[in-house]
Each structure stands twice: as structure tokens, then as C-alpha cells.
């Protein structure tokens, strides 16, 4: 696996590098789920700044757990209680934290390109924990690992990404990563929520959910940002749910057993029904991987931090 200095996105990342991260994740997953987990403190003494300008539950806590499992300490950052409220720029915030001798940055920011920007002004490793509508690479890695763990490979599996693709950083990173690893990707959404360049992405396009589900081996359901219903993208949340909500009734029509993923948080009974979201065992036409994704998120972030801080000279 080629040496990584930063992880700002999956666009342009080689299949070899992706495979290396997924292989390393597999090792950490085995340790993480062992009856008595015991981790090597390979990052002992390292300090990781979690710089989150947006709210987060799964991503922030899993990065914190990943760091602690490897022996590193974390510094929490909240924009609302920092000098950002006094007008301090992102650049100055990062430079000041670097001057405190932190060893790496995990950044979540509402502006697309922010992670790439700070990777150019610091010598420390930068991990993108979500930047605007651009990318969310560790979420895509955990989605890909979840799929690979179930199917044994990513090559030739068909993944339908359903929902608000236009505004989704999760969708973008998954498209880049899955296609690189040889998977087939389908996008299913109202035309108002598809990116204008969708036809150039090398994906299949669907506006009919039944057709997409009949094509797919797995469904990655995206969180619908509720403001889209008032922003002119959708007639109403109810109409969206009728046409694009993942329910047992709709799955039964496809007569296929699908793996169901969702990055969270869930809008229950809008993009996905309670029964589909919570079903982890048969009978039924689907298996929910939502909590498995959360577990895998810790292992993926351990692999990323280990690669950037311990394995890179």
C-alpha cells in the first residue's frame, strides 16, 4: 500500500491503497470484537485534534474510540465555544493547534474542500470527517468494508445508492471507492436530487425505486435532509416517502434478499421504515447492517489513524 500523508477523499485513490486500508480494518475488527479486546498502543503519546465545526455522533465518537484504542489522546474542539465565534479563521485555528504540538487533525467542516485546504497549510496528517457536500472518506470505507465482509469481495457487486445524491458527501465517496474496487453503482433518486453530471460518473441511473432494488445486491439509503422539502427539491416528505421510502412492501415486490446500509442518522418512516432499519435476522427480504456499520466505523478509523501516524515514515 502506498504511503498516505492525508486522507482527504477517495477520489483518485488507487485500488491497492483502498485494499490495504480494508485489509487493515479486517484485523482491527477481529481485535475489536474479541471477547477480551487487547490493542497494541502503537500511537502512545500521540495527540489527535478532533476539529468538528458540525454536529456528529457516530463519526466523532468512533474517531475518539479509535484513537484511544491505539493509545493516543484526543483534544475535543467545538466551534461554538472556540475563538471561531470571535472571527478566527479556519487557517488560524489549525495553525494555533499545530503550534500546541498536536500530531494530527480530524476535520469536519461545512465547506467543501476544507480538508484539502488545511492539508496544504499543515505538515501534520489530516483526515476528512466530512466537508460540505464533497466527501466523507471514512464513512465510505466503512460502508465498503461492511459490503466486502458480507459478500467476500467488492468486485461486480451491485450497490444502489438511494436518496439525496446531489447533496451527499457519503454518496460521492462511495461512488469513487466502489467503482475503483470494481463494484457496479446505481443511483436512484428524484431527478431534482441527482447531480447534473451523473451520466459521466460511470453509474446506472434510476428514478424508479422498484427497478433499482430489482437490479441491486445492496441498498445504501441516504439520509434525506428534511429542508429539501421546503427548498423546492421535493413536493413533500410524504410524497418522497411513498416513492422512495424503503419498506417491506416494496422489498417484497422485488423478491430479492438485499443488504441494507444507512450512514445515519435515520429519518424513520421517511427514507426507511422501522422494520427494515431494525431487521438483523430473517425472515424478510432484507438484512439491516446499520449497527454493524457503526462497529466497523471504529475499526476503519483505527486503520486510518494507524496508517497515517504509525505506518508512515
Swiss-Prot record:
GO biological process: 'de novo' pyrimidine nucleobase biosynthetic process; 'de novo' UMP biosynthetic process; amino acid metabolic process
InterPro entries in alphabetical order: Asp/Orn_carbamoyltranf_P-bd, Asp/Orn_carbamoylTrfase, Asp/Orn_carbamoylTrfase_sf, Asp_carbamoyltransf, Asp_carbamoyltransf_Asp/Orn-bd
GO molecular function terms attached to this record: amino acid binding; aspartate carbamoyltransferase activity
Pathway it works in: Pyrimidine metabolism; UMP biosynthesis via de novo pathway; (S)-dihydroorotate from bicarbonate: step 2/3
Residues the entry annotates as binding carbamoyl phosphate: 58-59, 108, 136, 139, 264-265
Enzymatic reactions: carbamoyl phosphate + L-aspartate = N-carbamoyl-L-aspartate + phosphate + H(+)
Gene Ontology CC terms: cytosol
Domain of life where this protein originates: Bacteria
Keyword Transferase tagged: yes
Enzyme Commission identifier(s): 2.1.3.2
S-adenosyl-L-methionine found in the keyword field: no
Chain sites annotated for binding L-aspartate: 86, 169, 223
Quaternary structure note: Heterododecamer (2C3:3R2) of six catalytic PyrB chains organized as two trimers (C3), and six regulatory PyrI chains organized as three dimers (R2).
Family the UniProt entry places it in: Belongs to the aspartate/ornithine carbamoyltransferase superfamily. ATCase family.
Entry protein name: Aspartate carbamoyltransferase catalytic subunit
Species name: Chlorobium luteolum (strain DSM 273 / BCRC 81028 / 2530)
Amino acid at each position: 500500500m502506498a504511503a498516505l500523508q492525508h486522507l482527504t477523499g477517495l477520489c483518485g485513490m488507487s485500488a491497492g491503497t483502498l485494499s490495504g486500508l480494508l485489509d487493515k480494518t479486517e484485523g482491527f475488527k477481529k481485535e475489536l470484537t474479541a471477547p477480551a479486546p487487547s490493542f497494541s498502543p502503537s500511537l502512545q503519546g500521540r495527540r489527535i485534534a478532533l476539529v468538528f465545526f458540525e454536529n456528529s455522533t457516530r463519526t466523532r465518537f468512533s474517531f475518539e474510540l479509535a484513537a484511544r484504542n491505539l493509545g493516543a489522546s484526543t483534544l475535543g474542539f467545538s466551534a461554538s465555544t472556540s475563538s471561531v465565534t470571535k472571527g478566527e479563521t479556519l487557517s488560524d485555528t489549525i495553525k494555533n493547534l499545530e503550534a500546541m504540538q498536536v500530531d494530527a487533525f480530524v476535520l469536519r467542516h461545512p465547506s467543501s474542500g476544507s480538508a484539502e485546504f488545511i492539508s496544504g497549510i499543515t505538515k501534520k496528517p489530516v483526515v476528512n470527517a466530512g466537508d460540505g457536500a464533497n466527501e466523507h472518506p471514512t464513512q465510505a470505507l466503512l460502508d465498503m468494508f461492511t459490503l466486502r465482509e458480507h459478500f467476500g469481495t467488492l468486485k461486480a457487486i451491485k450497490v444502489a445508492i438511494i436518496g439525496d445524491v446531489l447533496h451527499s458527501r457519503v454518496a460521492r465517496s462511495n461512488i469513487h471507492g466502489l467503482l475503483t474496487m470494481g463494484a457496479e453503482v446505481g443511483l436512484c433518486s428524484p431527478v431534482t436530487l441527482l447531480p447534473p453530471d451523473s451520466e459521466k460518473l460511470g453509474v446506472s441511473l434510476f428514478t424508479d425505486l422498484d427497478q433499482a432494488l430489482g437490479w441491486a445486491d445492496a441498498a445504501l439509503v441516504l439520509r434525506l435532509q428534511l429542508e429539501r422539502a421546503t427548498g423546492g427539491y421535493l413536493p413533500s416528505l410524504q410524497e418522497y416517502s411513498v416513492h422512495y421510502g424503503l419498506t417491506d412492501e416494496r422489498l417484497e415486490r422485488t423478491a430479492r434478499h438485499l443488504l441494507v446500509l444507512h450512514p445515519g442518522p435515520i429519518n424513520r418512516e421517511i427514507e426507511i421504515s422501522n422494520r427494515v432499519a431494525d431487521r438483523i435476522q430473517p425472515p424478510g427480504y432484507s438484512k439491516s447492517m446499520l449497527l454493524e456499520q457503526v462497529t466497523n466505523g471504529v475499526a476503519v478509523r483505527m486503520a486510518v489513524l494507524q496508517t497515517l501516524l504509525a505506518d508512515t515514515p
